[in-house]
């Protein structure tokens, strides 16, 4: 243990000396070069390249991991292929029935999952509407996009069709009738009275 501790101490001292030496060199360079920033353009370029390489490697690893995971899941779900080479007709029919049952089961599960997703989407939509109502924010309807050329065509079309009657105020025809005409249309009270008596 004594030798090992000595070796560790020497290693620490050596590292400290290296760090001290680097700091001294940096201080000398700073004094000699005036005010130069730590990140010189070359260092920035190197750092950028290193970051790009690292990001590309991580992306590649992630893609490989996802592809491997996908292969495992597919192999697990599909299972081993059935030997079809030396099979008679009865075994082939049995294998086909197994595959058919498996497909039906998977379609059933798929339908259930799709139904569940639709239900949850509906619930999410309802909850968002409630939240917006509570906040006082309302869903703005999507506006129909109209190009400026279509808009101009519509304006030109509306101005080209001149309709003078559309600008006139509409008037009720009954306002200008005389009261006498209204009275002439009405039946006398004695005629109405006899009808009322008959109804009773």
From Swiss-Prot:
Tissue-wise expression: Expressed in salivary gland, gut, muscle and cuticle (at protein level).
Annotated GO biological process: modulation of process of another organism; muscle contraction
Disordered, as annotated region: 1-20, 181-200
Keyword Coiled coil included in the entry's annotation: yes
GO CC annotation: troponin complex
UniProt keyword terms in alphabetical order: Coiled coil
Coiled coil: 2-116
Entry keyword annotation includes Coiled coil: yes
Annotated family: Belongs to the troponin I family.
Function: Inhibits endothelial cell proliferation and angiogenesis in a vertebrate host. Probably required for efficient blood feeding on vertebrate hosts.
Further remark: Rabbits immunized against the protein show higher resistance to tick infestation; feeding on immunized animals results in longer feeding duration for larval and adult ticks, lower engorgement rates for larval ticks and reduction in egg weights for adult ticks.
Name listed for the protein in its UniProt record: Troponin I-like protein
Species: Haemaphysalis longicornis
Lineage: Eukaryota, Metazoa, Ecdysozoa, Arthropoda, Chelicerata
Gene name of the encoded protein: p27/30
